[in-house]
Amino acid sequence: MVLLRVLPEIHTLTPTQLSGAACVWCRHALRPGEGIDLGSPGPARPHGCLSCCESKTRSLRTYLDWYDHGITCLRCPTGPCDRGEALGAAHLAVREEAGQPPMRCCACETDIAPGELVRPYLWERPDGPVLGYLHARDCPLPRPPS
């Protein structure tokens, strides 16, 4: 179920992506039997190409390593310790390599600028866990009005 959290929102996918004939991330056309079945509740059958799936797996693995450290470290919530900084840097490098969009703070809903202190933030929704980020200290801006 966690892998579904890294899928694009279902409503943003094309019919070709929903049917599994194209990668959900890069839109590369997939021949029958090619690609990795990502599963889905409901009629959609999304697939990913090997390159994108490997990239997303590395990103998820480094995120969870960073998160797991942060929930047990007494220092990391106010700014990373050396290990937390190394784990965060590893995750950010994987994100950059994968061409992922800028991180957004779950609290203030603004993009997190390069160099800002950040920490992973995981919470549960009824449809599964959500992997996000928070500014490591106070958010620089108030949350925009809804």
Predicted regions and their residues:
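Short Cys/His-rich Zn2+-coordinating modules
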Residues: M1-L13, R31-G35, C49, D82-R95
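Intrinsically disordered, low-complexity linker/tail regions enriched in polar/charged residues
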Residues: L7, T14-Q17, L74-P77, A107, ...
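Intrinsically disordered, low-complexity linkers and terminal regions
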Residues: R31, R61, D68, A98-R104, ...
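Short Cys/His-rich "knuckle" micro-motifs
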Residues: G33-I36, T57-R61, P80, G84-E85, ...
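Cysteine-rich micro-motifs
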Residues: L38-S55, T78-H91, W123-P142
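Amphipathic alpha-helical oligomerization segments
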Residues: T62-C76
